[in-house]
């Protein structure tokens, strides 16, 4: 339910309140791991002239670094507000939620002279469902059961290279 999820998000942000912005670098170094197959997925897509965007309900302090490391063409997420090198526990408006994810899908498709039906979108949460339904290929990746049951394409056990197989790539086409 959206209301309880929203309260959880507020609670999580409040837990960050007052922490040094340096905690982000520490978390990135010590706690963040990349999903298996992420690097191969992005390298293979890039070498074949594909465009990729990371659109997340998370925070830009993380997505910018993840996006740069993996080679996404652009990334969009929520901006944590800071004051005097400390996190305030607040997020810059507008919040990137389910409506904004759909808007980004259309904006990016339009920018590339594509229809949304020519785009693959991947998600795992309820806030991804509208975006997944508007994309030509909406993929539930290791999604919650309530999300997976609403998507025709589900990846429950494979790594991110499964997205390459969905597009017709064979393993010998992968760029490692």
Residue ranges, per PLM feature:
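C-terminal cap/substrate-recognition subdomain and adjoining C-terminal extension
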Residues: 17-176
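Single conserved hydrophobic/aromatic residue that forms the stacking wall/gate
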Residues: 1-11
């Amino acid at each position: 339910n959206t209301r309880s999820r929203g309260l959880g998000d507020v609670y999580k942000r409040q837990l960050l309140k007052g922490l040094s912005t340096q905690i982000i670098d520490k978390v990135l170094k010590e706690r963040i791991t990349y999903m298996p197959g992420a690097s191969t997925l992005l390298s293979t897509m890039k070498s074949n002239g594909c465009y990729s965007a990371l659109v997340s309900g998370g925070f830009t302090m993380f997505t910018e670094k993840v996006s740069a490391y993996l080679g996404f063409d652009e990334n969009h997420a929520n901006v944590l507000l800071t004051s005097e090198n400390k996190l305030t526990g607040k997020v810059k408006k507008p919040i990137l939620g389910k409506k904004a994810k759909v808007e980004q899908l259309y904006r990016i498709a339009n920018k590339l002279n594509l229809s949304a039906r020519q785009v693959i979108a991947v998600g795992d949460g309820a806030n991804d469902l509208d975006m997944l339904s508007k994309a030509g290929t909406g993929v539930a990746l290791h999604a919650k059961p309530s999300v997976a049951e609403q998507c025709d394409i589900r990846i429950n056990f494979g790594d991110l290279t499964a997205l390459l197989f969905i597009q017709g790539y064979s393993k010998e086409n992968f760029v490692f």
